[in-house]
Design a protein with these regions (language model features):
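PLP-dependent enzyme catalytic core of the Aspartate aminotransferase-like
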Residues: 14, 18, 270, 282-315
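Substrate-binding/gating loop at the entrance of the active-site cleft, primarily
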Residues: 29-30, 50-67
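Conserved PLP-anchoring active-site segment centered on the Schiff-base-forming lysine
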Residues: 38-57, 226, 268
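Active-site phosphate-binding strand-loop segment of PLP-dependent enzymes
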Residues: 71, 75-129
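Active-site PLP attachment segment
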Residues: 147-182
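Structural motif of enzymes handling amino- and sulfur-group chemistry
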Residues: 195-216, 222, 226
Length: 315
């Protein structure tokens, strides 16, 4: 930062902000750095943060560094959030932040973002949405679930990452110009580290160029078709009781026990399916799982085959 910005930073940040229809985008080295940087410095002493109990570890780490008081609410439970948050709404002088994700990484499910936005509008709360697993999957040109629902002007900040759908390094915090300026001056994970090199920025820009041209391709529609086919097959094969409900590209099959889920993963590997097991303590004991990530390149035959293997493998 002492040497100033490379022009590519200015260009790519403007490209990202324009794409997402927001005032500004500030690039960080990673999603972890973005969340730690944001949550360690934005909520102040005297503020309150309400966060979903299953938020990313990076958000939790950032909140541990924040002087604000932090309270969790039950996963995707709007009513639990409302009951807790509205107790503080009247006569509270500090800022109140509500933190969630548009798609949760270990479940693939989503909150009712419109209801979250409504309660934040009603009480003047600040809504923050981590969009790591929604970019390139939902909305026009893959702009994310916030944009698909038309909420981009009703959230205080979005955190997006480039290591998922775009397949490159980096992340960005989307918000207004004041937030951009504040983070540049106070986000330690941005200030006290070496910035991404120019070739990484070129990769991000190329990824966004691809998203900008998605309507000319069938990539996004093919992915949505695969998601729907997967859900239909799960129901048809009677697997609803072991799969976490999801409308995203992430679908999780619960296989209790670290050794059990690892064994099923090995069997799937024998059928050329690269499905990684998610083990305790990453997820709660008894909730170990297979995490299946769908792609536009998958065929319906592939999807049906993997689910048939699951049927024949899991007791």
């Amino acid at each position: 930062m002492l040497c100033g910005n490379h022009q590519l930073y200015n260009n790519v940040e403007a490209q990202i902000a324009n794409f997402h229809e927001v005032e500004s985008a500030l690039i960080f080295n990673s999603g972890y750095n973005a969340n730690v940087g944001f949550f360690s410095c934005v909520p102040q002493r005297g503020d309150i943060v309400f966060y979903d109990e299953l938020i990313h570890a990076s958000i939790r780490d950032g909140l541990r560094m924040s002087p604000a008081k932090c309270y969790k609410f039950d996963h995707n439970d709007f009513f639990n959030l409302r009951d807790k948050a509205e107790k503080f709404a009247e006569d509270f002088e500090g800022e109140i932040y509500v933190v969630t994700e548009s798609v949760f990484s270990m479940d693939g499910d989503s909150p009712d973002l419109e209801s979250f936005a409504d309660i934040c509008d009603k009480n003047d709360f600040n809504l923050i949405v981590d969009e790591a697993h929604a970019l390139g999957v939902f909305g026009e040109q893959g702009k994310g679930l916030v944009h698909k629902l038309g909420l981009q002007n009703r959230v205080f900040a979005q955190v997006i990452t480039f290591g998922k759908a775009l397949g490159c390094h980096g992340a960005a915090v989307l918000g207004n110009e004041n937030l951009y300026t504040y983070l540049v001056n106070f986000a330690s994970s941005l200030i006290y580290t070496t910035a991404l090199p120019p070739h990484a920025l070129a990769s991000i820009s190329a990824g966004y160029h691809f998203l900008e041209n998605l309507p000319k391709t069938k990539v996004l529609s093919k992915l949505q078709e695969n998601i729907e086919h997967f859900k239909i097959e799960v129901a048809r094969l009677g697997l609803l009781d072991i799969f976490v409900p999801s409308n995203s590209a992430i679908h999780c099959c619960i296989v209790p026990g670290n050794e059990s889920v690892k064994a099923v993963s090995v069997i799937l590997k024998g059928y050329d399916f690269e499905i990684k097991p998610i083990l305790y303590p990453t997820v709660p004991k008894g909730k170990e799982r297979l995490r299946i990530c769908l792609h536009s390149s998958n065929s319906k035959k592939d999807i049906s085959k993997i689910l048939k293997v699951v049927v024949n493998t899991i007791p």
